[in-house]
Amino acid sequence: MQLDIKICGLKTEDAIAAALDGGASHVGFIFFPKSPRNVDIETAARLRHLASGRAQAVAVTVDADDEMLDRIVEGMRPDVLQLHGHERPVRVEALKKRYHLPVMKAVSVREASDLEVLPAYRGVADRFLLDAKPPAGAELPGGNGIPFDWSLLASLDGKVDYMLSGGLSAVNIGEALSIARPRGIDISSGVERAPGEKDPDLIRAFFSAVRAARGKRE
């Protein structure tokens, strides 16, 4: 089974080069001022150009209004919109119609009941990103470096297409793939030397760990 790999929160050419050389299927750019991974549209557009023909560019937003989304879509030309806020199904559907782009909806997970929202988004979201629910008081909806109980995902219908996110690293990716068996994975803080600072060596190490884990499974 093909495994999509998204490196998220990219801001520099050396980081995106490491992601693309490693075989990333998706590269993510975050438009959220509170995040240390926040990037301006001009930088994202330049980096996005480097990924053209090699990986899908994902614009990550958090409860963004239409004006901001218009600027991002026009300036960066993303392949996918990732909605990482509290966007309801009707909002997701409206944005799909407005921009004619695939939408990945992030859902925060701590316990089984958190997955009960998924049916409401099926048919409007093209894919889910299942991320660890942020700790109390956290300012960021994702990228907090904490995993959740992957065994919770065993109850999901096999037709649910999702990327697994939250606290992934070269150390635990083998276990995560074995337990959750996702069709895609997303990593951000697990390949950083400091918040918002991607480390090309850690990106390469992550891809090596993924290949090793998949080799064992096969």
UniProtKB/Swiss-Prot annotation:
Catalyses which reaction(s): N-(5-phospho-beta-D-ribosyl)anthranilate = 1-(2-carboxyphenylamino)-1-deoxy-D-ribulose 5-phosphate
Record flagged with keyword Isomerase: yes
GO biological process: L-tryptophan biosynthetic process
Coiled coil: none
SUPFAM superfamilies with a match to the protein in the record: Ribulose-phoshate binding barrel (SSF51366)
Pfam family, one: PRAI
CDD domains referenced in this protein's UniProt entry, alphabetically: PRAI
Protein name: N-(5'-phosphoribosyl)anthranilate isomerase
Organism field: Chelativorans sp. (strain BNC1)
